[in-house]
Curated annotation (Swiss-Prot):
Function: Catalyzes the reversible phosphorylation of UMP to UDP.
Positions with a binding annotation for ATP: K16, V17, S18, G19, G59, R63, T166, Q167, Y172, D175
Subunit structure: Homohexamer.
Record GO terms (molecular function): ATP binding; UMP kinase activity
Name this polypeptide is given: Uridylate kinase
Amino acid sequence: MISNINALKYKKVLLKVSGEALMGDKQFGHEYEVIKKISSDIKEVIDLGVEVAIVVGGGNIYRGINAALVGMDRASADYIGMLATVINALTLQNVMESLDIYTRVLSAIPMMSVCEPYIRRKAKRHMEKKRVVIFAGGTGNPFCTTDSAAVLRAIEMNCDMLLKATQVDGVYDADPKKNPDAKKYCTINYKDVITNNLQVMDTAAIAVARENKLPIRIFSIKEQGNFARVIQDKGEYTTIEESVV
């Protein structure tokens, strides 16, 4: 463990957790042991002295884009998907608080009875008080992914880096599950991610990150303790940033 926060390169980060990551091996909903493991990983990073914010997806409950493909109005489908992210945020909050992690859920869609509305200054103040802020409701607008929400919130919170927890340990030039010869990138620039259509994040999210010089790190959430390792430049990951030497 690093006891001196000044020894860390990244002192404030945003973690993007997909809804699929919360359901483990299930086909729907939540796998609480998996959520507890993710929460333990987050606690390990907090104990390093790092300020942490989180954006959660909702794909384990509802995917708006899939519903739109079968005929549902896209905007309505996306709003339902946003509600799914609130369910996930509240679930994650409860598991984290069982581990004595102070949290606040802030939703882009106001739901005063269950969580706070998203107000940038309030969110920053929570983080200054060492609370983990869980952002729910996506951007609050349809036709936007939770990846875009993660990039926007990371920039608004002045985070040093956005870390996206996935099922693979980085960015590959092809799907490693389908192609055993797929090449993994250690680092790659924003332009190449877009040009090569690598689909680690949607194009809009990558473009906003590039414009604001927000580095993105892709890593696997499956291995216990990986979050803390990756934030210290250890372990397996891919970094997306402007300049690659």
